[in-house]
């Protein structure tokens, strides 16, 4: 069993040892080498180096994957290090492996899969977006430490988010929410051109391992 933590903050000081005592393998995603060292000190088994190219909330991330991955590899003490952030194609996987990654973590590409529960409008935005269309923001940190950065495709009525959230989002509002809220996506979004089965996406990415 694997416990995957997406924030290497102080809570991990207690959570990681408890998980390991229960026989779990602990994987921690970080956006800085300092946080990677903290996770390792607490006993993390696997580190995910999340470059600032990634979509969604970024773990203190302002460092691109090409600089971050070698820095975390240097302090990993032989632990596997996975690469995350903007990875979409076999070429991206191959580049990460050449830098020394043991594997990759992929998000946005699987939003654009047939099996994904993402709203159809969200999927369409991903297909339409170019690499230039994502933005690095700190304004949507609800439920996270204030100011936590994230990467999104901004939507046309993005500034209405507070009114929508304050009023409560009902199931019937899903179309409206998909049109108004910023949508999490990484910088690799410009290389996603079709909705395909997840297995096809995995097969494409796996070609980068050889």
Please give the residue ranges for each predicted region:
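Active-site entrance/lid segments in N-terminal catalytic domains of soluble metabolic enzymes
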Residues: 1-78
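Conserved active-site-proximal phosphate/metal-binding subdomains
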Residues: 58-82, 88-210
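Short loop or secondary-structure boundary microenvironments that flank
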Residues: 9, 85-86
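Acidic, glycine-rich active-site loops and adjacent beta-strand->loop/helix elements
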Residues: 53, 86-87
């Amino acid at each position: 069993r694997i416990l995957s933590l997406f924030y290497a903050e102080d809570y991990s000081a207690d959570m990681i040892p408890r998980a390991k005592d229960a026989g779990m393998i602990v994987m921690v995603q970080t956006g800085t080498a300092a946080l990677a060292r903290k996770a390792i000190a607490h006993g993390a088994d696997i580190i995910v180096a999340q470059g600032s190219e990634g979509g969604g909330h970024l773990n203190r991330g302002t460092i691109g994957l090409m600089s971050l991955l070698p820095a975390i590899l240097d302090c990993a003490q032989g632990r596997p290090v996975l690469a995350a952030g903007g990875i979409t194609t076999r070429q991206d996987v191959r580049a990460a492996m050449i830098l020394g990654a043991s594997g990759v973590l992929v998000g946005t590409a699987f939003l654009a899969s047939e099996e994904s529960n993402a709203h159809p409008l969200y999927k369409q935005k991903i297909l339409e977006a170019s690499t230039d269309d994502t933005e690095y923001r700190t304004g949507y940190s609800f439920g996270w430490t204030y100011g936590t950065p994230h990467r999104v495709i901004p939507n046309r009525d993005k500034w209405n988010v507070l009114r929508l959230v304050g009023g409560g989002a009902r199931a019937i509002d899903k179309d409206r929410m998909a049109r108004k809220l910023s949508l999490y996506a990484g910088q690799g979004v410009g290389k996603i051109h079709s909705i395909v089965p997840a297995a096809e996406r995995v097969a494409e990415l796996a070609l980068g391992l050889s």
